[in-house]
């Protein structure tokens, strides 16, 4: 997308933040209008995260106008909202490449720009990192300032409060900006969000802090702060002791779409010492009516026609694994009211929307709190219920201690439905599900299942749900199934693989949904093909039988080779003193960058041609 200067005359004058700061303050509202339109025009043509960025246009402009970035540090929590930041920091003409192979990274990324001071992607990390930078800046004593922008969803996570508690003790010069739009990805839940709603619907406090008076002095009354109430607030609202008890000087709420007021407030706050907290009210999807009306659907979008206001409908086709999981969940809950489903703020992505509506008493969205989700499930299991934790592979990393300490050691029957296992695609390094097999495999008594299609996925969910000997995990990918017919649910024999094809000399041991590619390769080279199904317990008898009958073995998985399922096969063969060549195929020892799933599989030789090529190169050594 080429930049049209005539269409965006003010934005054309601000291709860098240095140019932005040369603009007269009075031109900033026009700049914001053009920036918002440019974001709409570019994302509609290229796809990407959308509604979050629309909501922070004025805040982004104001922060870069006031703060001396990149000398001053500006941190965006999660990063979904950082497209305007990228546009203003020299990447305007490349914004159409975002989330594409070799394009701009979907999140702030240190290797991409000096303005991106922290790699992000997971939530609630900004205040901890920002505090560390602020303490370092204090020791440096050069006047460097640090500001963190965190959403009302991300701030509910425990890590954010741990950081604020420490910040209040350190007294470092740190600004935390709460971008409060009452929307994370799913609707926010929990007492903190309810508290903020109460603040906004209550009467203005008469007691104002002196610093607050100075910061807001000269500003017009706040307009249009209408959340869960039809009352208009005027002046400044102070939320009890919520943030001040943590040692912060609280200012706000202020209108996040009044760029001139934001500039005024931020200029005053930049001069204040110690931890500062600015509460900014914004509207997710601001300026584009369809996104304002339905910010969840417009959170991340494919290419679309802005004039129509409609997102393209997904082509009717094979069901996604997330949908298969959601259907199984509802089917099981209908027959068993002891089922309790737990998700850390990923209802839509995990396929749980229908379940949450049909079985509200068996559904728990614990917000962005993966650690709590897992230990909460442990408590449900102790109480005699049957918890199912629906969680993305990349987010399960955040609850590893709870998985071991609170679930596995106690051998509690908790089922983990691990979505987005393997290559996820455009969101890149922070979201690929490469490590789950490796970090789960070393946990004693953990059952790990890797379905090859949607029917096996259902059978494995059923198997794990009825397994009472300890925790179990079913790990399935992002994307659609293969069209396999769905059979009646039944428990699979624990730790048993299935031979799919008999061949000669070589056997391919497949773990997971690369089975179609493995089948194509097995046909081409006349290899035995096995659907191993279980990473743990491993079908040791079958592996040893295959080793005795073949000259070499190939293990195949869409996950980290180091510590993965193939490593389990290697360990068994070494322990049994079976000397046979083994090639482990999977993801290498590196973080996987953005791209489509097909592009990444091709690049890492995990499509059929690549697998066959890896085998041929190995045999030729």
Curated annotation (Swiss-Prot):
Residues reported to bind thiamine diphosphate: 80, 121-123, 153-154, 181, 288, 370
Keyword Isomerase included in the entry's annotation: no
Pfam families: DXP_synthase_N, Transket_pyr, Transketolase_C
EC assignment: 2.2.1.7
Catalytic activity: D-glyceraldehyde 3-phosphate + pyruvate + H(+) = 1-deoxy-D-xylulose 5-phosphate + CO2
SUPFAM superfamilies, alphabetized: Thiamin diphosphate-binding fold (THDP-binding), TK C-terminal domain-like
CDD domains: TPP_DXS (cd02007), TPP_PYR_DXS_TK_like (cd07033)
UniProt keyword annotations, A-Z: Isoprene biosynthesis, Magnesium, Metal-binding, Thiamine biosynthesis, Thiamine pyrophosphate, Transferase
Listed GO MF terms: 1-deoxy-D-xylulose-5-phosphate synthase activity; magnesium ion binding; thiamine pyrophosphate binding
Biochemical pathway: Metabolic intermediate biosynthesis; 1-deoxy-D-xylulose 5-phosphate biosynthesis; 1-deoxy-D-xylulose 5-phosphate from D-glyceraldehyde 3-phosphate and pyruvate: step 1/1
Cofactor details (free text): Binds 1 Mg(2+) ion per subunit. Binds 1 thiamine pyrophosphate per subunit.
One Gene Ontology term from the biological process aspect of the record: terpenoid biosynthetic process
Cofactor(s) needed: Mg(2+); thiamine diphosphate
Gene Ontology annotations for the cellular component aspect, listed alphabetically: cytosol
SMART domains with a match to the protein in the record: Transket_pyr
Record Gene3D superfamilies: 3.40.50.920, 3.40.50.970
Oligomer status and interactors: Homodimer.
Family: Belongs to the transketolase family. DXPS subfamily.
HAMAP family to which the protein is assigned, alphabetical: DXP_synth
Name the UniProt record assigns to this protein: 1-deoxy-D-xylulose-5-phosphate synthase
Lineage, opening ranks: Bacteria, Pseudomonadati, Pseudomonadota, Gammaproteobacteria, Enterobacterales
């Amino acid at each position: 997308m080429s930049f049209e200067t005539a269409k965006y005359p003010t934005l054309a004058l601000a291709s860098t933040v240095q140019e932005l700061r040369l603009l007269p303050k009075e031109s900033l509202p026009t700049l914001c209008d053009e920036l918002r339109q440019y974001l709409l025009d570019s994302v509609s043509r290229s796809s990407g995260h959308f509604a979050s960025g629309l909501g922070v246009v004025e805040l982004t402009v104001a922060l870069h106008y006031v703060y001396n970035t990149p000398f001053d540090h500006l941190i965006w929590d999660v990063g979904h909202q950082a497209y305007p930041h990228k546009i203003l920091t020299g990447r305007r003409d490349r914004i159409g490449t975002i989330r594409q192979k070799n394009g701009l990274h979907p999140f702030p990324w240190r290797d991409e720009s000096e303005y991106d001071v922290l790699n992000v992607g997971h939530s609630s990390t900004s205040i901890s990192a920002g505090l560390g930078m602020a303490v370092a800046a204090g020791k440096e004593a050069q006047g460097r300032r640090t500001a963190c922008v965190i959403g009302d969803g991300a701030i509910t996570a425990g890590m954010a409060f741990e950081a604020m508690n420490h910040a209040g003790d350190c007294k470092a010069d740190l600004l935390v900006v709460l971008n409060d739009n009452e929307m994370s990805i799913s609707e926010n839940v929990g007492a903190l969000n309810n508290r903020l709603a109460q603040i906004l619907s209550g009467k203005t406090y008469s007691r104002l802090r002196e610093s607050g008076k100075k910061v807001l002095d000269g500003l017009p009354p706040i307009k249009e702060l209408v959340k869960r109430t039809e009352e208009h607030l005027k002046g400044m609202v102070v939320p009890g002791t919520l943030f001040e008890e943590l040692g912060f000087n609280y200012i706000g709420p202020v209108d996040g779409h009044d760029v001139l007021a934001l500039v005024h407030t931020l200029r005053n706050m930049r001069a204040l010492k110690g931890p500062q907290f600015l509460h900014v009210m914004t509207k997710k999807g601001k300026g584009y009516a369809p996104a304002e009306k339905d910010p969840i659907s417009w959170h991340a979008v494919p290419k679309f026609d802005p004039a129509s206001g409609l997102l393209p409908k997904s082509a009717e086709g094979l069901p996604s694994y997330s949908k298969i999981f959601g259907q199984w969940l509802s089917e099981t809950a209908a027959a068993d009211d002891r089922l309790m489903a737990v998700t850390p703020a990923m209802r839509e992505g995990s396929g749980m929307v229908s379940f949450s509506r049909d079985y509200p008493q068996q559904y728990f969205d614990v917000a962005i709190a993966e650690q709590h989700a897992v230990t909460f499930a442990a408590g449900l299991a102790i109480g005699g219920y049957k918890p199912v934790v629906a969680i993305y592979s990349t987010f399960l990393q955040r609850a590893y201690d709870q998985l071991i300490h609170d679930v596995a050691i106690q051998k509690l029957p908790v089922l983990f439905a691990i979505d987005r296992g393997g290559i996820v695609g455009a969101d890149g390094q922070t979201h690929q599900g490469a490590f789950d097999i490796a970090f789960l495999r070393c946990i004693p008594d953990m059952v790990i299942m890797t379905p090859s299609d949607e029917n096996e996925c259902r059978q494995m969910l059923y198997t794990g749900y009825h397994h009472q000997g300890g925790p179990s995990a079913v790990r399935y990918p992002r994307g659609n199934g293969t069209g396999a017919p769905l059979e009646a649910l039944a428990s699979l024999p624990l730790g048993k693989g299935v031979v799919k094809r008999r061949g000669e000399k070589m056997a391919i041991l497949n773990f997971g949904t690369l089975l179609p590619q493995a089948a194509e390769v097995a046909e081409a080279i006349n290899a035995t093909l096995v659907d191993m199904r279980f990473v743990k317990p491993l079908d040791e008898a079958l592996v040893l039988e295959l080793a005795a009958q073949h000259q070499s073995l190939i293990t195949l998985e869409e996950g980290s080779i180091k510590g993965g399922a193939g490593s389990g096969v290697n360990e068994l063969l070494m322990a049994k003193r079976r000397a046979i060549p083994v090639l482990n195929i999977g993801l290498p020892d590196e973080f996987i960058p953005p791209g489509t799933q097909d592009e990444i599989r091709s690049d890492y030789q995990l499509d059929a041609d690549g697998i066959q090529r890896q085998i041929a190169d190995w045999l030729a050594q």
